[in-house]
Each structure stands twice: as C-alpha cells, then as structure tokens.
Amino acid sequence: MENLNMDLLYMAAAVMMGLAAIGAAIGIGILGGKFLEGAARQPDLIPLLRTQFFVVMGLVDAIPMIAVGLGLYVMFAVAK
C-alpha cells in the first residue's frame, strides 16, 4: 500500500507539471496570435503592444515554473 501512495504522488506531480506546460503553451500561442493581429491592425502601436506582450508572456510562463516547483516539492518532500 505504501508503494501505491508513492506512485500516486509521482503521477499527480507529473500530471500537474504536464498540464501546466500544455496550458502555458496554448496561452502563449493565443497571446502571440493576438499580438500579431493587433500589430497588423495598428502598426503605430507596435512598441506599446510589444511591451505588454512580453509582460503578459512572462506572467503566463511563470505558471509552469510554479507548477514545476510544486511538483518537485511533492515528489521529494511530501513523498518521504
């Protein structure tokens, strides 16, 4: 029974990290598409749009990093 609980913890951590990565990839793809759409519609606003794009992209990209940290915590600290 002990091994089953450990296996479930490892699977939960893997699923958490995988879903966070997939969600971030989808989010960055949508964000990039909207950035290109906005840049095509209003080329004068490209510097402003680029700044906002990189800020929001950093926020979207932070979610998988947090999930990896939590997943590693679950795998190595909780699973002892």
Curated annotation (Swiss-Prot):
One of its GO terms (molecular function) is lipid binding. The keyword Ribonucleoprotein does not apply. GO terms for cellular component: plasma membrane; proton-transporting ATP synthase complex; proton-transporting two-sector ATPase complex, proton-transporting domain. F(1)F(0) ATP synthase produces ATP from ADP in the presence of a proton or sodium gradient. F-type ATPases consist of two structural domains, F(1) containing the extramembraneous catalytic core and F(0) containing the membrane proton channel, linked together by a central stalk and a peripheral stalk. During catalysis, ATP synthesis in the catalytic domain of F(1) is coupled via a rotary mechanism of the central stalk subunits to proton translocation. Pfam families: ATP-synt_C. The record marks 61 as: Reversibly protonated during proton transport. This is ATP synthase subunit c. It comes from the Bacteria. SUPFAM superfamilies: F1F0 ATP synthase subunit C (SSF81333). F-type ATPases have 2 components, F(1) - the catalytic core - and F(0) - the membrane proton channel. F(1) has five subunits: alpha(3), beta(3), gamma(1), delta(1), epsilon(1). F(0) has three main subunits: a(1), b(2) and c(10-14). The alpha and beta chains form an alternating ring which encloses part of the gamma chain. F(1) is attached to F(0) by a central stalk formed by the gamma and epsilon chains, while a peripheral stalk is formed by the delta and b chains. The gene is atpE. It comes from Erwinia tasmaniensis (strain DSM 17950 / CFBP 7177 / CIP 109463 / NCPPB 4357 / Et1/99). Belongs to the ATPase C chain family. It is found in: Cell inner membrane. The chain crosses the membrane at residues 11-31, 53-73. Its main location: membrane. The lineage of its organism: Bacteria, Pseudomonadati, Pseudomonadota, Gammaproteobacteria, Enterobacterales. Keywords: ATP synthesis, Cell inner membrane, Cell membrane, CF(0), Hydrogen ion transport, Ion transport, Lipid-binding, Membrane, Transmembrane, Transmembrane helix, Transport. InterPro entries: ATP_synth_csu_bac/chlpt, ATP_synth_F0_csu, ATP_synth_F0_csu_DDCD_BS, ATP_synth_F0_csu_sf, ATPase_proteolipid_c-like_dom, F/V-ATP_Csub_sf. It is a multi-pass membrane protein. The keyword tRNA processing does not apply.
